[in-house]
Amino acid sequence: MHRVRFAPSPTGFLHIGSARTYIFNWLFARHHGGTMILRIDDTDVGRNSDASETSIFDGLAWLGLDWDEQYRQSERLPLHRAMADAILTKGMAYRDFTPAQAGDSEKSGAQGTWLFNAGMRELSREESDRRAAAGEPFALRFRVPHDREGSVQFTDAVYGEQAKGYGDIEDFALLRSDGMPTYHLANCADDADLRISHIIRGQEHLSNAFKHKLIFDAAGAESPTFAHLPLLMAPDGMKLSKRVHGPVVSVTTYRDAGFLPQAFINFLSLLGWSPKNDREKLSREEMVELFTLEGINRANAVVNFTEEEPFDAKALWLNAEHIRAMPAADLARELLPFVPVDLEKMLQITPLIQERIKLLRDVQSVADFFFVKQLPPYDSAELIPKKGDAAMAKNVLIKACDVLATAEFTHDGLEVALRAASAELGIKAGQMFEPVRVAVCGRKTAPPLFGTLEVLGREACLARIGQAIEKL
């Protein structure tokens, strides 16, 4: 049985690190014919936001990776409290009546300056029950066996054997004084109830796994296999952070720039995982076939970006490769949100630019002249061909007008007509094509000329060439 879960908290936009975690869980589930679970961990009421939750669902929808079961943590509070009660009944937790917020704090233990409150830990069960029955607020803390030799141990599927002494783990909170479960309790209760077999999550949670192993054992639940993923790092050596690195870590940024979902999945999958055959461009089906936890690296993965180029060079290369491999009709549909034309026109344009774009949004700069009636201003010197002058350019364009007025307006017909015209003028074909290209596109670098002329149509081409003649 292979059951895995992705459990985001709706407290911010979908981070590319979170997206990678989802991808690895999804690939693992599909590779083993298992179950993929989406669980929204929304018990931190003060930090949750509808916008964040929308971002998560929008991002996952864009990736196009499905899930089999869906849950919301806040709807499972009775389950969390039942586990807390069971652990308390076994004597493996105690009530902490420390006033104000001190009893809720888990930060002090993380700093290594606090392990437990002796007065609360040693309170008799009778006294604890009496104070609780009287309505005195309390936090519930796990009773870590500090008086025992030994350690919490488990084998991580990525990082290997792990151990932490009992004396190095604080009595962490299970319930806050308002009765709400902490992250540790809610996650363990849900993972146990949902029969999660493997917890695949970021390496930043590795330190939490010791506490979670204690909870699973105390509750009499089977501990899932842990597999912690290497961190995603920025070029500056810092962990990728929403706060520090901004939009570059948001899935939305990649979507809006024009990454294909399959290329983005391919890129993220290679940040910390290596397929056996060392190939880089992979289809979704190939990734499912090849994915194993054994292929995950321990070394942190770097996402390379700069202020000038916000996207990793490998991400851009992979996106371009996936764009080139797509059927032109499918690519045309992907390009539609970025252009002001209908599908019929985009189907004509796409084969001309498919080899020239790295991002879907590049269509706006590579093919902009298809989308306007009037070209933006350009320097008339651009019309002059190599080893030519303005007079040659003008003669070429006048001849082109005559030829295009009657030529068969197809790729092959236009090529035959313009090559014949260059021969008549006694010039090289390139000297004929260059002025025509600039006249109809507004620049020297453009998609293949004859296909471009065909898509623009006779009327637009003649009008643009006529305007170019007036410039000379």
From Swiss-Prot:
Its EC number is 6.1.1.17. A motif ('HIGH' region) lies at residues 8-18. It is an enzyme of class 6 (ligase). Signal peptide: none annotated. ATP binds at K242. Disulfide bonds: none annotated. One of its GO terms (molecular function) is tRNA binding. The keyword Cytoplasm applies. Its main location: cytoplasm. Catalyzes the attachment of glutamate to tRNA(Glu) in a two-step reaction: glutamate is first activated by ATP to form Glu-AMP and then transferred to the acceptor end of tRNA(Glu). This is Glutamate--tRNA ligase. It comes from Solibacter usitatus (strain Ellin6076).
